[in-house]
A protein has these predicted regions:
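Feature captures the FAD/FMN-dependent oxidoreductase FAD-binding
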Residues: 21-67, 157-165, 169, 176-177, ...
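FAD-site-proximal beta/loop scaffold in flavoenzymes
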Residues: 71-96, 158, 178-257, 291
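Mid-to-C-terminal Rossmann-like scaffold of FAD/NAD(P)H-dependent oxidoreductases
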Residues: 144, 154-164, 262, 269-344, ...
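Hydrophobic/small residue at the entry helix of a nucleotide-binding pocket
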Residues: 2, 106, 248
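Glycine/serine-rich phosphate-binding loop and adjoining beta1-alpha1 elements at the start
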Residues: 28, 36, 43-84, 333-346, ...
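A conserved FAD-binding loop/helix module that cradles the flavin
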Residues: 243-277
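Beta1-alpha1 glycine-rich phosphate/pyrophosphate-binding loop at the start
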Residues: 1-39, 63-66, 112-150, 154-159, ...
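Glycine-rich dinucleotide-binding loop and its adjacent helix/turn
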Residues: 20, 25-37, 62-117, 222-236
Length: 378
């Protein structure tokens, strides 16, 4: 399916499918030809068919820790489980209780997706509670939804009996350090803390990789992590470029979109263009009647209302309610690219951005407030 992790990985409660598919259709309607179910094993061979090739394969392969018992059939990677969940497949094969190893954003995606299927989840990680990699929203919302977080655990083995997973053997870690140069982890274990967390299956959310190193000769140089070696998106092979998570590792959707624009500019220059891909919009005269809010560039963000946890786990819908008309108007008033922007003086000193700093605007005739909301009176 087109869309990569947006349609086969990121949970629907975080990114509704309908909007993504609509965007994909816009792209197809513009004349882009998509070929699916075609495995590319040699980028250099593909280059013979085209003027340029872009490798944007993402990081769709999940990593597993080399634990005893990791080869049991009830052991999975986060990418496998998230793909099945996104496709609304039956997840009963996971059993009633699951241990998820890794408490980053992906680990929380798995845990919260399984909670919505009525599956109990123990989310475990080596990091202490204050060092967890997931953002605070995930941690708070996950706790509200029933995710059992077990931080500061080191993993010894996946236990099994009669060919089935029965639990995850761990011990408590008081502290740990990671040496980036050697990849070694040094831990201080709590004596006598070894225990087994009972579970029916184990899911690794311990990192992802491109999978390009699995091919005998993909045609471009890869670094030690299996990512393409690039310089301004150019790989080691002439006319072959790389972008997105395939060079940065897992990131945000908006970062991948930014990568797409940057590599498009690089490819355009390679093909003889100037690399300029920005749209030139029709010049319009500023409309003073839209109203002026003093210091509108520093108005706080209007936060969306979070649905109650009991309501959230009962479906896969967006966890946030939509803005009310008033809230939408307040948030839109913060736009820094509206017609009014052309009549605002730019900041000259960084100190202007500090608390208490003032933003001076040019005097405009016949101005009236865009909002009467007390929240914007300041």
């Amino acid at each position: 399916q087109l869309g990569g992790p947006m349609t086969s990985g990121i949970p629907a409660y975080r990114l509704p499918l309908e909007g993504v598919m609509q965007e994909i259709q816009y792209i197809l309607d513009s004349g882009v030809k998509a070929e699916v179910n075609r495995e590319i094993t040699d980028a250099a061979a593909l280059k013979k068919e085209y003027d340029a090739v872009l490798v944007a394969v993402g990081v769709s392969k999940g990593k597993r820790l080399p634990l005893p018992g990791a080869d049991l059939p009830q052991v999975y990677t986060a990418m496998d489980v998230l793909a099945d969940s996104r496709a609304e497949k039956d997840l009963s094969y996971l059993g009633k209780t699951v241990c998820v190893i890794g408490a980053g954003s992906v680990g929380y995606d798995v845990a919260r997706s399984l909670i919505r299927k009525g599956i109990a989840v123990h989310l475990t990680c080596l990091e202490q509670a204050d060092k967890i990699l997931a953002d605070m929203d995930d941690q708070t919302e996950g706790a509200q939804e029933g995710v059992d977080l077990l931080p500061g655990r080191a993993f010894e083995a996946i236990e099994g009996a009669e060919g089935r997973v029965t639990g995850l053997r761990v011990h408590t870690v008081l502290s740990s350090t990671y040496d980036k140069a050697t990849g070694q982890i040094t831990e201080v274990a709590q004596e006598g803390s070894q225990t087994v967390i009972p579970c029916d299956s184990v899911v690794f959310a311990t990192g992802q990789y491109t999978g390009l190193q699995d091919y005998e000769n993909f045609g471009i140089e890869l670094n030690g992590r299996g990512f393409p070696e690039v310089e301004e998106h150019r790989t080691s092979a002439d006319g072959i470029f790389a972008a997105g998570d395939a060079i940065t590792g897992i990131s945000f959707v908006i970062k991948a979109i930014q990568q797409g624009r940057l590599v498009t500019s690089a490819i355009d220059r390679y093909l003889g263009g100037d690399g300029q891909i920005d749209e030139t919009l029709v010049e319009r005269t500023a409309q003073p009647e839209i109203g002026c809010i003093e210091h509108f560039g520093q108005l706080p963000r209007v936060e969306q209302e979070l649905r109650p946890a009991a309501e959230r786990i009962a479906d896969n819908d967006d966890v946030y309610r939509t803005y009310s008309c008033q809230e939408a108007g307040c948030e839109a008033s913060r736009c820094l690219q509206c017609d009014l922007r052309t009549q605002i003086q730019p900041m000259r000193l960084w100190s202007k951005f500090l608390p208490g700093g003032r933003v001076r605007s040019l005097p405009l005739p016949a101005m009236r407030p865009a909002h009467t909301d007390p929240a914007h009176a300041a």
